[in-house]
């Protein structure tokens, strides 16, 4: 088993704290062990640029906004059922993503793939604030794409095997639109 009760990482620009408890049996297809993990912190733009230069990402490092990337993750479960109780990413003042839900049958043997296909039931919320700095770094002109401040997208994604269902409620300014989509890739 892997057990990291408290792990901290810091640079002048970033800070991450984590705890992990992982019995090896949690990684088996019908695992009985329970993984518990918690990660929280922020990654500064200078550190992101350093990593991107190490992986030879070309001009992509220039697109990173100056705001730090804030992260939070709390997950419990095993390969049969993993619960995401808190999963957040935020570029302060620009956008925030919040995801919660359940993922099922992450690892399968060939016999159980048809009787217990991989599945998920996930709720999400994406909130846009001032996107102009990020869009300009990406080379997108204001006239090409405009995301009004306060725009939000809330919805749900359900998946079972190759069958997908999704909903989204988009609110921007004084308007809104509700969307639904389904597909089966079989």
PLM-predicted stretches and their roles:
Residues 1, 6-9, 16-41, 69-80, ...:
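Extended lipid/amphipathic-ligand handling interfaces
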Residues 57-61, 139-142:
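Extracellular loop and loop/strand-boundary signature of outer-membrane beta-barrel proteins
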Residues 65-66:
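Short acidic/polar N-terminal linker immediately downstream of export determinants
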Residues 135:
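Extracellular/lumenal and peripheral-membrane lipid-interaction modules
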Residues 124-126:
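Intrinsically disordered, low-complexity segments enriched in glycine and mixed charged residues
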Residues 44-52:
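Outer-membrane beta-barrel translocator/channel fold
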């Amino acid at each position: 088993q892997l057990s990291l009760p408290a792990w901290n990482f810091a640079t002048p620009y970033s800070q991450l704290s984590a705890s992990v408890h992982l019995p090896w049996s949690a990684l088996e297809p019908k695992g009985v062990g329970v993984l518990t993990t918690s990660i929280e912190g922020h990654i500064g733009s200078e550190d992101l640029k350093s990593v991107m230069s190490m992986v030879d990402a070309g001009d992509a490092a220039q697109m990173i906004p100056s705001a730090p990337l804030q992260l939070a993750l709390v997950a419990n479960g095993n390969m049969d059922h993993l619960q995401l109780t808190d999963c957040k990413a935020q570029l302060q003042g620009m956008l925030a993503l919040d995801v919660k839900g359940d993922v099922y049958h992450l690892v399968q043997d060939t016999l159980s793939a048809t009787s217990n296909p991989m599945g998920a039931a996930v709720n999400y919320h994406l909130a846009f604030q001032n996107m102009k700095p990020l869009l300009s770094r990406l080379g997108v002109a204001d006239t090409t794409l405009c995301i009004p401040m306060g725009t939000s997208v809330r919805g749900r994604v359900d998946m079972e095997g190759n069958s997908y269902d999704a909903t989204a409620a988009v609110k921007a300014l004084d308007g809104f639109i509700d969307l639904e989509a389904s597909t089966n890739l079989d």
